[in-house]
Swiss-Prot record:
Domain CoA carboxyltransferase N-terminal: 30-294
Family, as annotated: Belongs to the AccD/PCCB family.
Native source species: Listeria monocytogenes serovar 1/2a (strain ATCC BAA-679 / EGD-e)
Binding site for Zn(2+): C34, C37, C53, C56
Protein name, per record: Acetyl-coenzyme A carboxylase carboxyl transferase subunit beta
Length: 294
């Protein structure tokens, strides 16, 4: 009897009960989990809400054409320069393979879509960056499309509205990519000198060379809630200044609080806000002209 106290207990045996196959399979894509509040919702309901979480207001990333569809008047958008695409100017290894993959993934030829449209009946030239394509990095074609769009707005006396979302300059194009910062900024300056209206809307993420050039050169500088906006990464800055940064550093709310944005606008309110601003800045044909400073 005492010996039984020191014997090893027998391992329990477990039987595996086969599944009866009655568990319903949920089709892929029918539900979406919010990365912010972790709530799960129907994807269709999320889409109806312009990809803004019904529970916490988190703004999910959206593609350029989806953003245009939700903003402009139905049937008013006419794309320009859709065929422009990069030619790998530096012969960077496997660059074109990556470009082709992004074309298939996004359905775009480049990381930005530009064109003419109306919002609330107000004409404008619109440009929307798409982070699915090379993280919307700014290469020579992106810079050229922005330049042409701004020049179109100048010629037609229309306001220019641009939605930014970028990881910065495109490293595979080297100096040709970096020069787009000056090229686009100069185009904005010329247009501004001619009396043109520029509205920038910074979305998540707007970083690197884009944030350091044209992204904040608008007459109105807006951002979507929660958008990451900044030049260098948080860890790089902390290691450089040897200080711990605020938790909300480089967010749209932080920039608004420190006077670097005019407003932080929910995607749900953006169409009405833009329509109102455009309506009070309507410029009659032939009105305007250069101002001092060009």
């Amino acid at each position: 009897m005492l010996g039984d106290l020191f014997t090893k207990p027998k391992k329990r045996k477990y039987a595996t009960i086969p599944s009866d196959g009655t568990k319903a399979d949920v089709p892929e894509g029918i539900m979406t989990k919010c990365p912010e509040c972790k709530k799960i919702m129907y994807t269709k309901e999320l889409q109806k809400n312009l990809m803004v979480c019904n529970y916490c207001g988190f703004h999910h990333p959206i593609g350029a054409k989806a953003r245009i569809d939700m903003l402009v008047d139905e049937g008013s958008f006419e794309e320009i320069d859709a065929s422009l695409t990069t030619a790998n100017p530096l012969g960077f290894e496997d660059y074109m393979d990556r470009i082709e993959k992004d074309k298939q993934k996004s359905g775009l030829n480049e990381a930005i879509v530009t064109g003419h449209a109306t919002i609330g009946g107000n004409p404008l030239v619109i440009a929307v960056m798409d982070s699915r394509f090379r993280m919307a990095s700014m290469g020579s074609v992106v810079g050229e499309k922005i330049l042409r769009a701004v020049e179109d707005a100048d010629k037609t006396n229309k306001p220019f509205v641009i939605f930014t979302a970028s990881g910065g300059a495109r490293m595979q194009e080297g100096m040709l990519s970096l020069m787009q910062m000056a090229k686009t900024s100069a185009a904005f300056k010329r247009f501004s000198n001619h009396g043109g209206l520029i509205i920038t809307v910074m979305t998540h993420p707007t970083t690197g060379g884009v944030s350091a050039s044209f992204a904040s050169l608008g007459d109105y500088n807006f951002a979507e809630p929660g958008a990451l906006i900044g030049f260098a990464g948080r860890r790089v800055i902390e290691q450089t200044v040897r200080e711990e940064l605020p938790e909300d550093f480089q967010t749209a709310e932080f920039l608004l609080k420190h006077g670097q944005l005019d407003d932080c606008i929910s995607r749900l309110d953006l169409q009405n806000k833009l329509s109102f601003i455009l309506s009070i800045h309507v410029k009659a044909p032939g009105v305007g002209g250069e101002v001092d400073g060009e």
